[in-house]
Amino acid sequence: MAENSLLEDSFIQYKCSEYTVGEYYNKINAHSDIGRYTTIIKAINPNIYTPINISLESTIQRLSNEKLPKISDKEGRTNLALQLTKHYGFLYLPKHIESFNHDIELNQHVSLLPLTEEMLRPYEGESVGQWIKLVETIQYAFNRINIPDFTKSMRSAEVFFHDEQIQLYLNEVNPVYDFDKETISLKCDSIASAIMLYIVSNKRRLKSCEVCSKLFYAKRSNAQYC
């Protein structure tokens, strides 16, 4: 059971049926031809998706023990990000769907507000780096919580940017009040923010297995093995 009473143990994700990955040229802005090529994962049909209920604890267990390919192994990192997208879906598709539904509802109440092409545009996909960054941050957070001296051998700049990334994920968590039910809940923009909130809220349950050294969430305070 989560320590934070507002915390959820699962997260609703949305999965498309097929995904593809490729190099795309991203312009800095619409008024300039300057940009760079980025490896992006896209859905074959982004307008068709299925909601799935993801267990946060089992997802965190998997990602915390995922072996990340080296930075120089671009193909390995691309394949891992594609594999994770196929299994869990896009990180920020829920936020896109929420924004789209909000625009539709707003349009129903404000007839003067037209539905623009930007509002109706399907989700354009995500860079490979987004999943890789999440896995890196999860593993850093686990070690930072479980190993007291973990950051002593790290450069201060490295610690700063990892801590900053954790905070960026947590900044995507917002309290929401339901006036009809008179209840308050924590709403996460993405599975990334839901995962990070779960990690920091359950840090006292985090243990290191005495046999394989893998980190796991203990059901009992005296648990020693995963």
Say what each PLM segment does:
Residues 219-226:
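Cysteine-rich micro-motifs
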Residues 1-215:
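Short helix-coil boundary/hinge micro-motifs
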